[in-house]
């Protein structure tokens, strides 16, 4: 069938947005609402992925579990946050989705909101109690991702919710190292203005100023030292 992503018909219906057919199937056999497919995904995971809000709401009304993880550790909230499904994120949080759940990579939904530049979703997650300094398996935070990607508004949002600017990942890099390395000028200036250190060395014994390209290092040095 079209939209065949799963070995379970009910998951394919959820992914392709066929609400009436999905309702018929589930009302005939309630267990289908929570059955898992080859990826350990339920209909809820697939509806979140494709952004079918009505199907998500139908499944949530049935009381399906909101925190079940697929075989890569992704919850429905991870999927919805990464895919930019604002209304679905709101609905999942309203049903008690765990905002700091981690997947196999140690990532929370906020990590994906930050790297994909999902502003409204990041705010919803943070308002819902997301830890702004949660670290993935590389000890990187949402701030590392926003800085590397050059997501200026996301950095503003994270700063508003008191995210740290000086956490080091497994390579010893702070968000400022990454911003400098990727030539994210405005992002680097914002980080320094909010307390990011220009003196922290990474594992290669380099400071952010030493990885900065062009005239960025000088700009940042002047900001700090005058």
UniProtKB/Swiss-Prot annotation:
Q: Which UniProt keywords apply?
A: ANK repeat, Apoptosis, Chaperone, Cytoplasm, Nucleus, Repeat
Which SUPFAM superfamilies does the entry mention? Ankyrin repeat
InterPro entries named in the record: Ank_repeat_dom-contain_49 (IPR051637), Ankyrin_rpt (IPR002110), Ankyrin_rpt-contain_sf (IPR036770)
Region feature Required for nuclear localization, mapped onto this chain: 1-37
Q: Where is this region: Interaction with RB1?
A: 1-71, 171-226
The GO terms this record gives for MF are: RNA polymerase II-specific DNA-binding transcription factor binding; transcription factor binding
Kindly list the biological process annotations in GO that this record carries.
apoptotic process; negative regulation of apoptotic process; negative regulation of DNA damage response, signal transduction by p53 class mediator; negative regulation of MAPK cascade; negative regulation of NF-kappaB transcription factor activity; negative regulation of release of cytochrome c from mitochondria; negative regulation of transcription by RNA polymerase II; positive regulation of cell growth
Pfam name, any one: Ank
Q: What does this protein do?
A: Acts as a chaperone during the assembly of the 26S proteasome, specifically of the PA700/19S regulatory complex (RC). In the initial step of the base subcomplex assembly is part of an intermediate PSMD10:PSMC4:PSMC5:PAAF1 module which probably assembles with a PSMD5:PSMC2:PSMC1:PSMD2 module. Independently of the proteasome, regulates EGF-induced AKT activation through inhibition of the RHOA/ROCK/PTEN pathway, leading to prolonged AKT activation. Plays an important role in RAS-induced tumorigenesis.
Quaternary structure and interacting proteins, as annotated:
Part of transient complex containing PSMD10, PSMC4, PSMC5 and PAAF1 formed during the assembly of the 26S proteasome. Stays associated throughout the assembly of the PA700/19S RC and is released upon association with the 20S core. Interacts with PSMC4. Interacts with RB1. Interacts with CDK4. Interacts with MDM2. Interacts with RELA. Associates with a CDK4:CCND2 serine/threonine kinase complex. Interacts with ARHGDIA and increases the interaction between ARHGDIA and RHOA, hence promotes ARHGDIA inactivation of RHOA and ROCK.
Kindly provide the name given to this protein in its UniProt entry: 26S proteasome non-ATPase regulatory subunit 10
The species is Homo sapiens
Q: Which gene encodes it?
A: PSMD10
């Amino acid at each position: 069938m079209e939209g065949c992503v799963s070995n379970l018909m009910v998951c394919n219906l959820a992914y392709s947005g066929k609400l009436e057919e999905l309702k018929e199937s589930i009302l005939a056999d309630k267990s289908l609402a929570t059955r898992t497919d080859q990826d350990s995904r339920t209909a809820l995971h697939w509806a979140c992925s494709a952004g079918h809000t009505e199907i998500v709401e139908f499944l949530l009304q049935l009381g399906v579990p909101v925190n079940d993880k697929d075989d890569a550790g992704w919850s429905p909230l991870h999927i919805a946050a990464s895919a930019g499904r604002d209304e679905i994120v709101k609905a999942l949080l309203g049903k008690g989705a765990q905002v700091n759940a981690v997947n196999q990579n140690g990532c929370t939904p906020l990590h994906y909101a930050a790297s994909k530049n999902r502003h409204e979703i990041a705010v919803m997650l943070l308002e819902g109690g997301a830890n702004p300094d949660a670290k993935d398996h590389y000890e990187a935070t949402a701030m590392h991702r926003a800085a590397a990607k050059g997501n200026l508004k996301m950095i503003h949002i994270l700063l508003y919710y008191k995210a740290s600017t000086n956490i080091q990942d497994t390579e010893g890099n702070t968000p400022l190292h990454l911003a400098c390395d990727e030539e994210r000028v405005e992002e680097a200036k914002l980080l320094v203005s909010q307390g990011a250190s220009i003196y922290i060395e990474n594992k290669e014994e380099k400071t952010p100023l030493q990885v900065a390209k062009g005239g960025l290092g000088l700009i940042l040095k002047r900001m700090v030292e005058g």
